[in-house]
């Protein structure tokens, strides 16, 4: 983070960098600045009057808030934002501002190779076809499935009626209820298999649409390299590198580990937007996540970016 003080020692601004999609939301479902908005309020309320807290998104392409899909309690970004804000305050009070801190700004162009998604598109089309063919008719609809699922989860041993009727049938040498349970359980399994297949199909179709969209864009560009701006900023010991893609966390960690500057920060989503930019390894080991498919660049982009960053950091 970066702390800027006025000459009289008051804090003018705090720039803080954190990696996470701000998608937690608030309980009433309204518009919100999310966890970073709450964090900025905590920071501004606890420093000099008029202090401005400025959030800079980090390498959050594959980072989401904990419990952001929770269905058992209202989802609120405020607790997470408060924790983030307190963490910033804890660190910012340790920073000592220097009147003669060096200032440097660099920005250069970088040409990145575009991806050819044709092989993955073919793979997903085949998977889509297999999934559709795997769907089979059952004797249940949603209403009867929910009724049976409730019954058979409430009572594993005697789901269809009270236990005494099962024992009566057994004493009479009959197994009507047992046969009914066997048939119902078979139909429940078949229905659940269809649901699982449909969930898989929605993921396949979502990723397929993303790949096809970016394949169309890249073909329209004639496979010309994608030109982006990479910038580097130094204010005293604070060093920030920027990139227009949704960088994943491993990219940021790699840059920090290799940097000769003690406090190096990385900002994605900056000076343009080129969708997700996963590591080369993530692009080779696709797992159905959005960042695997919502991507314009080829795996070689990563090393080119590291090389450019290393050059800029040396110049700072």
Locate the predicted segments by residue.
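Non-catalytic substrate/cofactor recognition surfaces at enzyme active-site rims
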Residues: 1-316
């Amino acid at each position: 983070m970066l702390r800027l003080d006025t000459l009289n020692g008051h804090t003018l601004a705090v720039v803080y960098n954190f990696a996470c999609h701000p998608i937690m939301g608030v309980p009433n479902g309204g518009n919100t600045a999310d966890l970073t908005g709450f964090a900025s309020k905590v920071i501004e309320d606890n420093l000099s009057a008029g202090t401005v807290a400025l959030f800079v998104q980090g390498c959050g392409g594959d980072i989401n808030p904990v419990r952001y899909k929770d269905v058992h309690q209202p989802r609120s970004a405020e607790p997470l934002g408060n924790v983030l804000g307190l963490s910033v305050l804890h660190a910012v009070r340790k920073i000592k501002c220097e009147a003669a801190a060096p200032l440097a700004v660099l920005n250069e162009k970088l040409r990145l190779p575009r991806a050819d998604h044709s092989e993955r598109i073919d793979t997903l089309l085949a998977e889509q076809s297999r999934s559709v063919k795997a769907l089979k008719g059952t004797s249940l609809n949603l209403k009867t499935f929910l009724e049976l699922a409730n019954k058979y989860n409430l009572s594993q041993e005697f789901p269809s009626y009270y236990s005494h009727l099962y024992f009566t049938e057994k004493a009479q040498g009959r197994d009507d209820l047992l046969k009914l349970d066997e048939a119902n359980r078979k139909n429940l399994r078949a229905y659940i298999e269809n649901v699982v297949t449909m969930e898989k199909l929605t993921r396949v179709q979502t990723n397929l649409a993303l790949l096809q969209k970016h394949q169309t864009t890249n073909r329209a560009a004639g496979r010309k390299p994608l030109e982006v701006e990479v910038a580097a900023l130094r204010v005293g010991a604070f060093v920030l590198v920027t990139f227009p893609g949704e960088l994943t966390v491993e990219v940021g960690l790699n840059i920090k580990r290799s940097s000769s500057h003690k406090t190096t920060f990385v900002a994605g989503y900056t000076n343009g937007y080129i969708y997700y930019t996963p590591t080369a390894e993530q692009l080779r080991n696709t797992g159905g996540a959005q960042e695997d498919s919502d991507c314009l660049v080829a795996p070689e982009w990563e090393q080119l970016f590291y090389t450019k960053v290393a050059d800029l950091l040396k110049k700072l």
